[in-house]
Amino acid sequence: MSEQIAAVRRMVEAYNTGKTDDVADYIHPEYMNPGTLEFTSLRGPELFAINVAWVKKTFSEEARLEEVGIEERADWVRARLVLYGRHVGEMVGMAPTGRLFSGEQIHLLHFVDGKIHHHRDWPDYQGTYRQLGEPWPETEHRRP
């Protein structure tokens, strides 16, 4: 297994366990996920750790990612994952529904200096929203 694929699997393990004490080993100091730009200007391992905590807070401590497939090309890794969770925390203004859900995701990860630098992900928002019962937002959304 390549070092890049091993790093992506460590990323998945962090989301599954909530443990982020070693993320600087595989997350670049300038790591970014463009999906977070609306909420924060943070970068690097700190941003990644916040994202992991948000997933656990919003989708329960039992939330987990399952690897479906993983491929590598040069400085890029593409991971096909499924997120399983229960909606237990506020999400984009929607109160917790308590409902279980699962949703497929595609993650594209670019590596710089052997670490994950740029992370794009495309979750199945529509399918997840349906599984949550299509709740209406109750407040304006501001993710910390």
UniProtKB/Swiss-Prot annotation:
<comment type="similarity">
    <text>Belongs to the polyketide cyclase DnrD family.</text>
</comment>
<comment type="pathway">
    <text>Antibiotic biosynthesis; daunorubicin biosynthesis.</text>
</comment>
<feature type="binding site">
    <location>
        <position position="51"/>
    </location>
    <ligand>
        <name>substrate</name>
    </ligand>
</feature>
<comment type="function">
    <text>Involved in the biosynthesis of aklavinone which is an important precursor common to the formation of the clinically significant anthracyclines such as carminomycin, daunorubicin (daunomycin), rhodomycin, aclacinomycin T (aklavin) and aclacinomycin A (aclarubicin). These compounds are aromatic polyketide antibiotics that exhibit high cytotoxicity and are widely applied in the chemotherapy of a variety of cancers. Catalyzes the cyclization of aklanonic acid methyl ester to yield aklaviketone.</text>
</comment>
<dbReference type="GO" id="GO:0017000">
    <property type="term" value="P:antibiotic biosynthetic process"/>
</dbReference>
<comment type="pathway">
    <text>Antibiotic biosynthesis; carminomycin biosynthesis.</text>
</comment>
<dbReference type="GO" id="GO:0044598">
    <property type="term" value="P:doxorubicin metabolic process"/>
</dbReference>
<dbReference type="InterPro" id="IPR009959">
    <property type="entry name" value="Cyclase_SnoaL-like"/>
</dbReference>
<dbReference type="GO" id="GO:0016872">
    <property type="term" value="F:intramolecular lyase activity"/>
</dbReference>
<comment type="subunit">
    <text>Homotetramer.</text>
</comment>
<dbReference type="Pfam" id="PF07366">
    <property type="entry name" value="SnoaL"/>
</dbReference>
<keyword id="KW-0045">Antibiotic biosynthesis</keyword>
<feature type="binding site">
    <location>
        <position position="105"/>
    </location>
    <ligand>
        <name>substrate</name>
    </ligand>
</feature>
<dbReference type="InterPro" id="IPR032710">
    <property type="entry name" value="NTF2-like_dom_sf"/>
</dbReference>
<dbReference type="GO" id="GO:1901771">
    <property type="term" value="P:daunorubicin biosynthetic process"/>
</dbReference>
<keyword id="KW-0413">Isomerase</keyword>
<protein>
    <recommendedName>
        <fullName>Aklanonic acid methyl ester cyclase AcmA</fullName>
        <ecNumber>5.5.1.23</ecNumber>
    </recommendedName>
</protein>
